[in-house]
């Protein structure tokens, strides 16, 4: 029949996956799915949902959005469950804050955890408070907890046993991060009645029941497609092109705003090279130093890496926010989201396909979910200077195809400087899936410390693109507009 056999990953528990590309609204889908699933259950049973996320910042984002009465997620839940919804994080559950046998039976209860709170070797359960005796939850001992569901070597009042007795629906966000043996044990320990996976990159053992195509997202103006990918010869050129392109996009956004459009402040994501074998090449701090050396105001530059989060507490969508440049390695894959991010300027040679997809996904979300008058504001851009361009493209393509995109959703080209001997045909027609001709180029493999700022023509006080950069920017933007029109034509033809 061509249908993939069901994989019984969690014994005797329905376990399905919804594959949704980045920016595809998977959280909103999950909110609707909760109601659909519970509508098939006995109405007298408690409605408990364990919502699992892989990272702490995504946990906070999820809990906040599900709790905020003005957010579409919470508004949908309130509509579906008659405003009887309570969202809990781990600490409020452990303390029994607004959490008791009566409330549990009368409302939709959503427990938001990150994997690390629950994913623990069965021999080390004493290391987690969720597995320990809890006096604040004594009221559940004789009213909710079922004796035959109590985990070995745990007290009946432990939070884990209360959750097990509620036989919850489990939602696993970014479920491709929950494939290890410990992750399977984590799910089994919850005694789920149903497991719903949400991911852009499902693993081979996933039971995919729904697939959202990227073209449908474009038709609804949810994503910035096509992705325009350009490879440069040197890292100075990447920085130069990114800065000038950002300025051009911002000028277009300002003009559109003056004509009644929404306010947009385009942002560049600079992807730094992670340290390799103790070397310190192309690190995030050095990129920031170079941008400041170019006289870019420091308040416009923020770093977001593991261990340093200068974006904490900043609302990037606030029209008074000055941030235009964000430097990262791969921390932005962890649930970070800002529709104003338009340009990914990668100063790293390569990364894994999944990492590329997750980082590239940060520039795909369309601001305000509407089509903008200026064509360039409906596209996203990736600028690189990689000697491994073909390998980098292979990773981008593989990652995005796995995430529901196709080879019609990109345009890729190399910008070749004059001193590099290639033909016009080679320089202008290196499309992502067109031809197999190799172009020999000589890339500068120096780290960011050796970048010559004098070779970067960007002036933050000027209003025009510098002549030196104008050719490259014109090439990028003109081709982007052409590809955008071609993409729109395909959408119309497919309608």
What are these model-predicted stretches?
Residues 326-343, 361-363:
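SF2 helicase motor core recognition
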Residues 173-174:
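Walker B catalytic acidic pair
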